[in-house]
Amino acid sequence: MEGPEQWVIVGGWGSASAEFSEGLSRNMGLKLVKPVFKLFPDEEEYVRIEGDISGFTGAIVVQSFERPASRSLVYSLLIADALKEAGVGRIVLMAPYMGYTRQDRVFLPGEPVSVRAVMRALASSGYNALASIEVHKEYVLDYFDGSTLNIFPFTYMLKETGISCGDNTIIVAPDKGSLPRVERLARETGCRSYGYLVKERDRITGEVRLAKSTVDPRGKNAIVVDDIISTGGTIALASQWLLENGANSVFVLAAHYLGIGNAEEKMMKAGVSRVVTGNTLPRKPSKIVTYVDLTGLAAGQLTKLVSNL
């Protein structure tokens, strides 16, 4: 990175954070520092940043909220405090996958707005800016007291996989919440056919069902777009409906892939032919999931972000 100020990449805890920090360091031309992480006998987290970092005026901490998310959160807070203690003036959290964002409001009485509490904690710990890749709802970044960046990955992912949007392609949001993603992807790729499915979720049991649809998939190759695949239930439901209603095939784009339990088996049984996701969470061996390196995309946008801090 050009300029008089010196920035450093600080790798976070976990395999996804390690991979992403190495990619950012390579793409941004910045030094990478790898802290020491360990647990005390009572399982309290401990971190130490080795080496002299006092000469750096800024740091980009790469910490994805991989499981358990609470551990990722605590390590991100401890790293920020360690950097402040070392005299680093400006600190950016690059969270490839930002946790706690799905509890963005009170669904049942007595619940917290979890993402608000987390954003406040991160800002209080010393972070001046926060960047992530396709957060669940972009407005949750407003809870963070500082500069924010939400990186849209889907156009880049399609390009990297060599898939184009032809006349027989339809882009589908598995629920109305993902419609803005689909609209933007359609706009940037020139895809004229898109829409969304309407799902209903039982807040107690978590059971999901499709209520209706705004798309006609007959004779189309469907691209389903969502921010995250967790248990695979939503994607499986969408794929099954699309194929039953005449779609030729179902291809999935997801920014993040947790793949909990039998998610892959569930999607395969529902007819999903391929899933393309980002390297924001730990990679899993898979028959249908392909990972796209998003560090090149993130590097360019982070360079602009830090230049304005």
UniProtKB/Swiss-Prot annotation:
E.C. number: 2.7.6.1
Binding site for ATP: 42-44, 102-103
A GO cellular component annotation in the UniProt record: cytoplasm
Main location: cytoplasm
Gene from which this protein is expressed: prs
Binding positions for D-ribose 5-phosphate per the UniProt entry: 201, 226, 230-234
Catalytic activity: D-ribose 5-phosphate + ATP = 5-phospho-alpha-D-ribose 1-diphosphate + AMP + H(+)
Originating organism: Aeropyrum pernix (strain ATCC 700893 / DSM 11879 / JCM 9820 / NBRC 100138 / K1)
Group of enzyme by EC: transferase
Binding site for Mg(2+) 1: 136
Family the entry assigns: Belongs to the ribose-phosphate pyrophosphokinase family. Class III (archaeal) subfamily.
Keyword Transmembrane helix: no
Pfam families from the UniProt entry: Pribosyltran (PF00156), Pribosyltran_N (PF13793)
Binding site for Mg(2+) 2: 175
GO biological process, one term: purine nucleotide biosynthetic process
Annotated localization: Cytoplasm
NCBIfam families recorded: ribP_PPkin
CDD domains: PRTases_typeI (cd06223)
Domain of life: Archaea
Protein role: Involved in the biosynthesis of the central metabolite phospho-alpha-D-ribosyl-1-pyrophosphate (PRPP) via the transfer of pyrophosphoryl group from ATP to 1-hydroxyl of ribose-5-phosphate (Rib-5-P).
Residues annotated as the enzyme's active site: 199
GO molecular function: ATP binding; kinase activity; magnesium ion binding; ribose phosphate diphosphokinase activity
UniProt protein name: Ribose-phosphate pyrophosphokinase
InterPro entries noted in UniProt: Pribosyltran_N, PRibTrfase_dom, PRTase-like, Rib-P_diPkinase, Rib-P_diPkinase_arc
Pathway as given in its UniProt record: Metabolic intermediate biosynthesis; 5-phospho-alpha-D-ribose 1-diphosphate biosynthesis; 5-phospho-alpha-D-ribose 1-diphosphate from D-ribose 5-phosphate (route I): step 1/1
